[in-house]
Swiss-Prot record:
Keyword Cell cycle: no
Protein name: GTP-dependent dephospho-CoA kinase
InterPro entries in the record: GTP-dep_dephospho-CoA_kin
Pfam family, one: DUF359
Alphabetically ordered keywords of this record: Coenzyme A biosynthesis, GTP-binding, Kinase, Nucleotide-binding, Transferase
Binding site for GTP: 21-23, 40, 42, 92
Molecular function GO terms recorded: GTP binding; kinase activity
Highest taxon above the source species: Archaea
Function: Catalyzes the GTP-dependent phosphorylation of the 3'-hydroxyl group of dephosphocoenzyme A to form coenzyme A (CoA).
GO biological process terms on file: coenzyme A biosynthetic process
HAMAP family given in the database record: Dephospho_CoA_kinase_GTP_dep
Organism in which the protein naturally occurs: Pyrobaculum aerophilum (strain ATCC 51768 / DSM 7523 / JCM 9630 / CIP 104966 / NBRC 100827 / IM2)
Pathway connected to this protein: Cofactor biosynthesis; coenzyme A biosynthesis
PANTHER family reported in the protein's UniProt record: GTP-DEPENDENT DEPHOSPHO-COA KINASE, UPF0218 PROTEIN TK1697
Length: 140
């Protein structure tokens, strides 16, 4: 997490969004409060996030694995403004792409890799690639 703090500081991050239960819990554990977060409250590691009350608004959405539903997309649109926890019934992983596309400049999107790694992407550096990726995704 020290690396994430260093990245955020050197990048001048103004907002940090987290996707995933373990990632979000680790941010809280290390004193980094995300601007908004998306969780599904299901993890292989049995993590329970107690600090979710810091978010002003809870949005519950349905989102199947491998998709970003319109409902989930709308929730991310609200979440990038801040103070939102998105509770996903289904799978939240793909929402990291929506956060990268919709987040304002000087934002970081952090999500977990299934093998246990933490990925923290400065959106200004990756937004162009994510926008191209959306050209290949099917609209559902």
């Amino acid at each position: 997490m020290e690396v994430v703090k260093d990245i955020a500081e050197s990048y001048g991050a103004e907002r940090i969004y987290t996707v995933g239960d373990v990632v979000t819990q680790n941010f809280f554990k290390h004193g980094l409060i995300p601007t908004s977060a998306a969780v599904d409250e299901k993890t292989r590691r049995g993590v329970r996030i107690e600090q979710l009350a810091v978010f002003k608004r809870v949005i519950k959405v349905n989102n199947p694995p491998g998709y970003i539903t319109e409902e989930a997309w709308s929730a991310v649109e609200e979440a990038v403004r801040g103070g939102v926890i998105i509770k996903v019934e289904g799978e939240e992983d793909m929402l990291s792409l929506a956060f990268i596309k919709l987040a304002p400049p000087k934002s970081i999107v952090a999500y977990g890799h299934y093998l246990g790694a933490l990925i923290a992407l400065p959106v200004d550096w990756y937004k162009e690639y994510v926008l191209k990726l959306f050209d290949y995704l099917e609209k559902c």
